Amino acid sequence: MSKIGNRTITLDPAKVNLNFQKDHIAVKGPLGQIELKLPPNLPLKFELKDNNLQITRNNELKQSKIFHGTYNALITNAIIGVTQGFEKKLRLVGVGYRANVEGETLNLQLGYSHPIKEKIPKGLTVKVEKNTEITISGISKELVGQFATEVRKWRKPEPYKGKGVLYFDEVIVRKAGKTAEGKK
């Protein structure tokens, strides 16, 4: 039994408008619109009653159970995205590490011999504060997380000095260096 799929999704009709089509679901809110594509022959039914969305399965096959939880989570994330939005914060730790935004490009200097230029995807806003704090925000949870991961991959945090691109609340478990074990 899918626990996530059985959750009802509560809607605020003043803020969110759902439109169900044969091949997609459109979620419209104050921050924008998200369209979720639906696979053909989806074994789910969507019922909207009294500002609550209930998703039910047509059968008990394994594939139906998988879709049940997945689409419940995707619709919930779309509703949160168009009403509140999503945000990820990154911080740059290291000597000379800095970032700035020029138009649609995020420029990073992470200790390489050349600057790194990351194109900012449509639908995202990137702000840089104090040259070392990057805030990525948008209505799509997937897109925000994916871009944050792309930026982070350029210089993953290392455990000896703690340098790199870190999520704002991330804690790096530090390792002792070679000299910490004792000299012979």
From Swiss-Prot:
GO MF annotation list: rRNA binding; structural constituent of ribosome
Record InterPro entries: Ribosomal_uL6-like, Ribosomal_uL6-like_a/b-dom_sf, Ribosomal_uL6_a/b-dom, Ribosomal_uL6_bac-type, Ribosomal_uL6_CS
Keyword DNA repair in annotation: no
Recorded GO CC terms: cytosolic large ribosomal subunit
Pfam families: Ribosomal_L6
Gene Ontology biological process: cytoplasmic translation
UniProt keyword annotations, A-Z: Ribonucleoprotein, Ribosomal protein, RNA-binding, rRNA-binding
Self-association state and partner proteins as the record states: Part of the 50S ribosomal subunit.
Function: This protein binds to the 23S rRNA, and is important in its secondary structure. It is located near the subunit interface in the base of the L7/L12 stalk, and near the tRNA binding site of the peptidyltransferase center.
UniProt record similarity statement: Belongs to the universal ribosomal protein uL6 family.
PANTHER family found in the cross-reference section: 60S/50S RIBOSOMAL PROTEIN L6/L9, LARGE RIBOSOMAL SUBUNIT PROTEIN UL6M
Protein name per its UniProtKB record: Large ribosomal subunit protein uL6
